[in-house]
């Protein structure tokens, strides 16, 4: 059994359902400290939702050394119905060339692969020309309030600079390394409450139906072309996720209706400009309303440069593939790290089974992931030596 597979299985066997860490960080710290990493625990959140975070850094001598950070999460989503699993989700199980277990793809394999890649890289290059750090959290699959976000805020307060970040999210589609994420769209949610006047449904002249009033405005928002996107991002999208109105009775005009919606926005728009345009539409339709906004993350983009080139070269050397740069999909903790790090790239194993019953990874894909990380480290070292 390879060292990477062994560490992956050890991590899967720890039932770290968000926000629980279940001992993952202790296991990883034990592997990192012999390599010279100073490990700092940065826990956050109330006792009822305590989040475990680890900041591990290996620093060299000399001023203004660049810093590479690997970001990952030890927490996993809930298992779902246990009876639907072919094998216990926290018992690593091999079947038909695949390793089954919750977190196999998202993202315990990536964490194990990077740690082993570090072991191999530092054995051959004990004094690299850049510092290396890991930022690991047990709050990525949950609210993401007390995890990476808190650590990034602390690093910013301390003036710690990050230059390159690899996020180990599962990004591959058909083959290992065929796609990496060099950016993500921003996300912003709104909760709109349109006010009316409740009344008997047989006497509409004595009431004001907020659903009827809201519909033209919602139709206009749904039809709006917010921007045209660009070479890296599709156009910004606006979608309604929930609508709640009425008392449950069939003869009552409701007094208010609440609409939840979400923007996924690209770098052609800002959160502020989108908010202004929404308010303009609502005001144009003469609605009496309240609107609360929640910004989940700003968009970020890493154009081809030092880190993207290193990852592409590593994938090419390991697999022969010319990887696709993509900004599709949901958000990740990269949105927080991008606030203090100008180059952020996500690269990891297949995302085909993430969050599903019988989550798994093809065993033959595990070593290539580790090798891609190791080759990226080697390529960054080569670039710094030039």
Swiss-Prot record:
Subunit field text: Homodimer.
GO BP of this protein: diaminopimelate biosynthetic process; L-arginine biosynthetic process; lysine biosynthetic process via diaminopimelate
Residues that coordinate or bind Zn(2+) 2: 106, 141, 355
InterPro entries: Bact_exopeptidase_dim_dom, DapE_proteobac, Peptidase_M20, Peptidase_M20_dimer, Peptidase_M20A
Enzyme Commission numbers on file: 3.5.1.18
Presence of keyword Ligase: no
Sequence positions that bind Zn(2+) 1: 73, 106, 169
Keyword vocabulary terms for this entry: Amino-acid biosynthesis, Cobalt, Diaminopimelate biosynthesis, Hydrolase, Lysine biosynthesis, Metal-binding, Zinc
Top enzyme class: hydrolase
Active site (catalytic residues): 75, 140 (proton acceptor)
Function in brief: Catalyzes the hydrolysis of N-succinyl-L,L-diaminopimelic acid (SDAP), forming succinate and LL-2,6-diaminopimelate (DAP), an intermediate involved in the bacterial biosynthesis of lysine and meso-diaminopimelic acid, an essential component of bacterial cell walls.
UniProt cofactor(s): Zn(2+); Co(2+)
Catalysed conversion reaction: N-succinyl-(2S,6S)-2,6-diaminopimelate + H2O = (2S,6S)-2,6-diaminopimelate + succinate
GO terms of molecular function: acetylornithine deacetylase activity; cobalt ion binding; succinyl-diaminopimelate desuccinylase activity; zinc ion binding
Cofactor note: Binds 2 Zn(2+) or Co(2+) ions per subunit.
Organism encoding this protein: Delftia acidovorans (strain DSM 14801 / SPH-1)
Family as reported in the entry's similarity comment: Belongs to the peptidase M20A family. DapE subfamily.
UniProt pathway annotation: Amino-acid biosynthesis; L-lysine biosynthesis via DAP pathway; LL-2,6-diaminopimelate from (S)-tetrahydrodipicolinate (succinylase route): step 3/3
Name of this chain's protein: Succinyl-diaminopimelate desuccinylase
The keyword NAD is annotated on this UniProt entry: no
């Amino acid at each position: 059994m390879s060292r990477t597979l062994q560490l992956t299985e050890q991590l899967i066997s720890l039932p770290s359902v968000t926000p629980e860490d279940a001992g993952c960080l202790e296991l990883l710290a034990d592997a990192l400290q012999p390599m010279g990493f100073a490990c700092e625990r940065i826990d956050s959140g109330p006792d009822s939702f305590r989040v475990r975070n680890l900041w591990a850094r290996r620093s060299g001598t000399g001023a203004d050394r660049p810093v590479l950070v690997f970001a990952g999460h030890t927490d996993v989503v809930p298992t779902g119905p246990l009876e639907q699993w072919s094998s216990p989700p926290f018992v690593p199980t091999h079947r038909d060339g695949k390793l089954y277990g919750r977190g196999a793809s998202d993202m315990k394999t990536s964490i194990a692969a990077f740690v082993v890649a570090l072991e191999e890289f530092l054995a051959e290059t004990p004094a690299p020309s850049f510092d290396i750090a890991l930022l690991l959290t047990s709050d990525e699959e949950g609210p993401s309030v007390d995890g990476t976000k808190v650590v990034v805020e602390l690093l910013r307060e301390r003036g710690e600079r990050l230059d390159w970040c690899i996020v180990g999210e599962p990004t591959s589609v058909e083959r290992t390394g065929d796609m990496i994420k060099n950016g993500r769209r921003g996300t912003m949610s709104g909760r709109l409450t349109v006010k009316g006047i409740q009344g008997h449904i047989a006497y509409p002249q004595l009431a004001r139906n907020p659903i009827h009033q809201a519909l033209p405005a919602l139709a206009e928002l749904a039809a709006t072309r917010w921007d045209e996107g660009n070479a890296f991002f599709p156009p910004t999208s606006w979608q309604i996720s929930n609508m709640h109105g009425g008392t449950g009775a069939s003869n009552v005009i409701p007094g208010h209706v609440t609409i939840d919606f979400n923007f996924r926005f690209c770098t052609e728009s800002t959160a502020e400009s989108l908010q202004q345009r929404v308010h303009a539409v609502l005001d144009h339709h003469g609605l009496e309303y309240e609107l609360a906004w929640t910004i989940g993350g700003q968009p970020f983009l890493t154009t081809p440069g030092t880190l993207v080139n290193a990852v592409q070269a590593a994938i090419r050397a390991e697999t022969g593939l010319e990887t696709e740069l993509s900004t599709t999909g949901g958000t990740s903790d990269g949105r927080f790290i991008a606030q203090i790090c100008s180059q952020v790239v996500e690269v990891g194993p297949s995302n085909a089974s993430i969050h599903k019953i019988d989550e798994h990874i093809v065993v033959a894909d595990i070593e290539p992931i580790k090798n891609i990380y190791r080759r990226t480290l080697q390529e960054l070292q080569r670039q710094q030596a030039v």
